[in-house]
Amino acid sequence: MKEIEKLKEEYPLLNKLIETEEVLWVNPNMEKYETAIKDSPLSEENVKDAKERLKRFASYIAKVFPETKETKGIIESPLLKIPSMKQALEKNYEQPILGELLLKCDSHLPISGSIKARGGIYEVLKHAEQLALQHGMLTEEDDYSILDSDTCREFFAKYSIAVGSTGNLGLSIGIMSAKLGFNVTVHMSADAKQWKKDLLRSKGVNVIEYEADYSKAVEEGRRQADADPSCYFVDDENSHDLFLGYAVAASRLQKQLEELEIIVDEEHPLFVYLPCGVGGGPGGVAFGLKLLYKDNVHCFFAEPTHSPCMLIGLMTGLHDKIAVQDIGIDNVTDADGLAVGRPSGFVGKTMEPFLSGDYTVSDEELYRLLKELADTENIYLEPSALAGMIGPVRVCKEDAYLQKQQLMEKMQKGTHIVWGTGGSMVPEDVMNGYYKTGEALTILEK
């Protein structure tokens, strides 16, 4: 790796990142959609394939997770207008937000209460389908609800699934795998919250805890799976299937925007702010949105000031060859879902030509935003899920991106979507603690 001093000279923004200051980085490598898609390792066909697979499984999902009955086994979340929060942001940050503000509530996705219910559940279902088809338990024409049988559960019990996680991916993989009958092990990093470990164990999942961070948990999970031919490893750092499971969100969102009569075109730009850990969730969603809205959607990743792994990987072009710890950042944050020191090289390289930018936000800010959203809209998210909330303020305030893309005149007709990535499964006492922290920090600030 280039010497750190050389990197700092080449990328002056690194100095601010090292000081854990909040920054906004505009991606100089973003290309027009038509150019970017030509070199992409994934295509619209891949996303369609994932969408069809989820449809095939819908009857099974509706049967085994009654909370999805109403949506006929489709795992989806509400898209809500949040005008009171918008007013509060404008007042608190003394910055007008041009355009409408909405919250995509993946925090309230059924089954596992986070964005990871998309990619995680999808990858487990795909693996189950492959095994069942190979062994004649299923044909693609069958009603997949037949998988809810003792015979199928006994069959899947011969196989195991492993994953490394800071929490939410572990929940979605663990809950789904256990429901199908797989033996499942979740390797959890030091920052994983206790209640997430407890919940998994209550579902019959084997949880292994590590003193080290996320990368170590993934490494150990991979090692265990390599030693056991019947074990399938969900590789959060490199998985195309996870990525595609997230990408399906885009066409669902398109339908919701149409229902709300919100237009997205050249005169009506769409901005989407996505909390980013290793990169799979936000990368997949952003990729799906780019396929649909091309140059009319502008996607920004949001990371904690203490874990800006994707920003550093993208900015330096080193991707997964650099970790935040290499430049003296500690990767310690209360935004547990985003506490990742080394980004996914696959996601970074795939998204580099599509992504508008990336910004960082402090833990203190996340807590204040958590309290504000609860007060104004009565919506409770976990700290990491608030990372996107400051995005519209940042992009409108530091308007270099808007100027560069000649969007200033179009902003009044634009739409901002903050992706709320998790929170509905947080136990009440834990959420009260988050709220109180936000309250104390708000008083301090004033």
From Swiss-Prot:
User: What is the E.C. number?
Assistant: 4.3.1.18
What is one Pfam family matched by this protein? PALP
Its needed co-factors are: pyridoxal 5'-phosphate
Q: Is Lyase there in the keyword field?
A: yes
What PROSITE patterns does UniProt report for this protein, alphabetically?
DEHYDRATASE_SER_THR
Top EC category = lyase
Q: Where are the transmembrane segments?
A: none
**CDD domains reported in the protein's UniProt record:** D-Ser-dehyd (cd06447)
Q: Which domain of life is it from?
A: Bacteria
GO: which molecular function terms? Answer: D-serine ammonia-lyase activity; hydro-lyase activity; pyridoxal phosphate binding
Per the record, what are the reactions this protein catalyses? D-serine = pyruvate + NH4(+)
Q: Which GO terms describe its biological process?
A: D-serine catabolic process; isoleucine biosynthetic process
Q: Which UniProt keywords apply?
A: Lyase, Pyridoxal phosphate
Record keyword Repressor present: no
Q: Which InterPro entries match?
A: D_Ser_am_lyase (IPR011780), Ser/Thr_Dehydratase (IPR050147), Ser/Thr_deHydtase_PyrdxlP-BS (IPR000634), TrpB-like_PALP (IPR001926), TrpB-like_PALP_sf (IPR036052)
Q: Which residues carry this modification: N6-(pyridoxal phosphate)lysine?
A: 116
As for family, the record states: Belongs to the serine/threonine dehydratase family. DsdA subfamily.
Q: Which HAMAP family match?
A: D_Ser_dehydrat
Q: What is this protein called?
A: Probable D-serine dehydratase
Q: Which organism is it from?
A: Bacillus cereus (strain 03BB102)
